[in-house]
From Swiss-Prot:
The record marks D418, D430 as: Involved in capsid protein dimerization upon acidification. Residues 128-150, 181-217, 543-575 are annotated as: Disordered. Capsid protein p27: Proton-driven dimerization of the C-terminus facilitates capsid assembly. Residues 217-259, 290-298, 351-362 are annotated as: Involved in capsid protein dimerization. This is Gag polyprotein. Gene3D superfamilies: 1.10.1200.30, Acid Proteases, Human Immunodeficiency Virus Type 1 Capsid Protein, Immunodeficiency lentiviruses, gag gene matrix protein p17, Zinc finger, CCHC-type. PROSITE patterns: ASP_PROT_RETROV, ASP_PROTEASE, ZF_CCHC.
């Protein structure tokens, strides 16, 4: 094969130039053609009659497997062979120019029967015949200056006409001193001794025939035999079906690879890219029906396996239909032998049932390729049916979710859907514009029109987020990480100190101002008919905050004693700690972040709301529209809120809530811990308990 590769490579370099294939590519192509049965020997490639079948077979293989490397190499080789043929560069002339010419030799004499076969070996690529003129020119006597052809002069006496020698009609013995037979050791030794070979010995080695006698058989071409043995040896590839010296053989799959694939399917699922990559790698080489069915039975459950069997049968029926229309289909063995059928492809024919060795021996290479490709396509269909992807239209970016995480969920859902590949990118970009947070939507709206792919949109948003101010999710994450140690310290201190029933930390009492209990548990609470109650504004007795005469002067602040429900004492004297421009002149609205500090698992740990600063409300009330549905609440001691419109049912948060006010520049005020009330009101209200805890006073600055 090496000699054929060298000849073809030289021709390709001559006629193809820089695009000529390498010797490695030519050797791989020749090995494939021999394996498919398209060439009995590499030298058969010189025959123009084999060119069209080779082109058809490689084209069909490229369409089935999607691999066009061998087809491209064959196209270059075919062009070189056709160019050489058009220039009428025959094989005899090429061998003559390269010094590789040979000739027929009669059967050896008795003296040569005992010689080893290596002495009779000839180089690969030699022709068994040669023209009479060339042969006689080589066998001219050494003392003659000009070669003499047979029929014009006698070999012994040199007479041109009228020779009566008995050997006049016989051709001379072959010239054994040429370099055409480098392995003939006996001839080389005789030449090394410096003596001419006797004519008798020459005749005994290769006795010439007489006139009219048929030429003897050629010597065995051991170079060609060596090529045949090398071509039938096991290839250096990892295939379940290998070709050995004694014929095709079946080798089992690696158990570790199957175990790892089964674990990947169980942990990652059928639609995972890792699973698909491992399945494609394991089925990259032809598999027997025995291996295919057992592999799918291991990695698939009962229901997916039943779906796969049906899908595999449909794919095999497609192969059979194509093979029926084309007699030279690869599954039909290029027209040699019987046509393929469903029983053969499923391994149910005679001699194949439950017998992998029989399947390896009886199935053609084209059938093995079709079986494996159909099984892989059926597996892809089952993966889409057994594990459908979630609806991409319902995916939205959460309040505290980063844009990258949102993009990951969206792209995974879109790629797992049934959308055509050409429509996936526009759908992803449209979801970025509609399903992301408002600040991200604003960035995407201001993006240049040249950004047309999801990757460009993601990169643009990430670059802008690096230079833009903190977003809501960034503020929530930063505040949560900074306040969490302080929250735990406060909770631990309250547990170690003053606790009420149930072990829950208590704030300040609204009646007596003492810590450790609520107003409902206050021992000094006003009895029915008792007019001695404490004012929450001036700390006086006998009246309440609504009746206090100092209400207009201090806006409900008590001099000398803070009423914060959190761990921070109230400022003395009260001062403005929050300076901001309200969104409305007549209604002081602020942006607030609420963080649940409890251990109860919730979907969203932080939410953003808009609340009204109301110094006339005793407590902070969160509207049920703003309150997350999965945040736990409990019944309050006072089940109603009394206002101008009457009583409103009220509940209370079971977990401690961290409340922070966000300024216009994105900065945060000092957070506050409290248990807010939850009621069906039109908007959330920050009452006096929150204002006092923040040290806030509303004025007309």
């Amino acid at each position: 094969m090496e000699a054929v590769i060298k000849v073809i490579s030289s021709a390709c370099k001559t006629y193809c130039g820089k695009t000529s294939p390498s010797k490695k590519e030519i050797g791989a192509m020749l090995s494939l053609l021999q394996k498919e049965g398209l060439l009995m020997s590499p030298s058969d490639l010189y025959s123009p009659g084999s060119w069209d079948p080779i082109t058809a077979a490689l084209s069909q293989r490229a369409m089935i497997l999607g691999k066009s490397g061998e087809l491209k190499t064959w196209g270059l080789v075919l062009g070189a062979l056709k160019a050489a043929r058009e220039e009428q560069v025959t094989s005899e002339q090429a061998k003559f120019w390269l010094g590789l010419g040979g000739g027929r030799v009669s059967p050896p004499g008795p003296e040569c029967i005992e010689k080893p076969a290596t002495e009779r070996r000839i180089d690969k690529g030699e022709e068994v015949g040669e023209t009479t003129v060339q042969r006689d020119a080589k066998m001219a006597p050494e003392e003659t200056a000009t070669p003499k052809t047979v029929g014009t002069s006698c070999y012994h006496c040199g007479t041109a006409i009228g020779c009566n020698c008995a050997t006049a009609s016989a051709p001379p013995p072959p010239y054994v001193g040429s370099g055409l037979y480098p392995s003939l050791a006996g001839v080389g030794e005789q030449q090394g001794q410096g003596g001419d070979t006797p004519p008798g010995a020459e005749q005994s080695r290769a006795e010439p025939g007489h006139a009219g006698q048929a030429p003897g058989p050629a010597l065995t071409d051991w170079a060609r035999v060596r090529e045949e043995l090398a071509s039938t040896g096991p290839p250096v590839v990892a295939m379940p079906v290998v070709i050995k010296t004694e014929g095709p053989a079946w080798t089992p799959l690696e158990p570790k690879l199957i175990t790892r694939l089964a674990d990947t399917v169980r942990t990652k699922g059928l639609r995972s890219p890792i699973t698909m990559a491992e399945v494609e790698a394991l089925m990259s080489s032809p598999l027997l029906p025995h291996d295919v069915t057992n592999l799918m039975r291991v990695i698939l459950g009962p229901a997916p396996y039943a779906l796969w069997m049906d899908a595999w049968g449909v794919q095999l029926q497609t192969v059979i239909a194509a093979a029926t229309r084309d007699p030279r289909h690869p599954a039909n063995g290029q027209g040699r032998g019987e046509r393929t059928n469903l029983n053969r492809l499923k391994g149910l024919a005679d001699g194949m049932v439950g017998n992998p060795q029989g399947q390896a021996a009886l199935l053609r290479p084209g059938e093995l390729v079709a079986i494996t490709a159909s099984a892989l396509q059926a597996f892809r269909e089952v993966a889409r049916l057994a594990e459908p992807a979630g609806p991409w239209a319902d995916i939205m970016q959460g309040p505290s979710e980063s844009f990258v995480d949102f993009a990951n969920r969206l792209i995974k859902a879109v790629e797992g859907s049934d959308l055509p590949p050409s429509a996936r990118a526009p759908v992803i970009i449209d979801c970025f514009r509609q399903k992301s947070q408002p600040d991200i939507q604003q960035l995407i709206r201001t993006a240049p029109s040249t950004l047309t792919t999801p990757g460009e949109i993601i990169k643009y948003v990430l670059d802008r987020q690096k230079t833009a101010p903190l977003t809501d999710q960034g503020i929530a994450a930063a505040m949560s990480s900074a306040i969490q140690p302080l929250i735990m310290a406060v909770v631990n201190r309250e547990r170690d100190g003053q606790t009420g029933s149930g072990g829950r930390a208590r704030g300040l009492c609204y009646t007596c101002g003492s810590p450790g209990h609520y107003q409902a548990q206050c021992p000094k609470k006003r009895k029915s008919g008792n007019s001695r109650e404490r004012c929450q504004l001036c700390n006086g007795m006998g009246h309440n905050a609504k009746q206090c005469r100092k209400r207009d002067g201090n806006q409900g602040q008590r001099p000398g004693k803070g009423l914060s429900s959190g761990p921070w004492p109230g400022p003395e004297p009260p001062a403005v700690s929050l300076a901001m421009t309200m969104e409305h002149k007549d209604r002081p609205l602020v942006r607030v972040i609420l963080t649940n500090t409890g251990s109860h698992p919730v979907k969203q740990r932080s939410v953003y709301i808009t609340a009204l600063l109301d110094s006339g409300a005793d407590i902070t009330i969160i509207s049920e529209e703003d309150w997350p549905t999965d945040w736990p609440v409990m019944e309050a001691a006072n089940p109603q809120i009394h206002g101008i419109g009457g009583g409103i049912p009220m509940r209370k948060s079971r977990d401690m809530i961290e409340l922070g006010v966000i300024n216009r520049d994105g900065s945060l005020e000092r957070p506050l811990l409290l248990f807010p009330a939850v009621a069906m009101v039109r908007g959330s209200i920050l009452g006096r308990d929150c204002l006092q805890g923040l040290g806030l006073r509303l004025t007309n600055l």
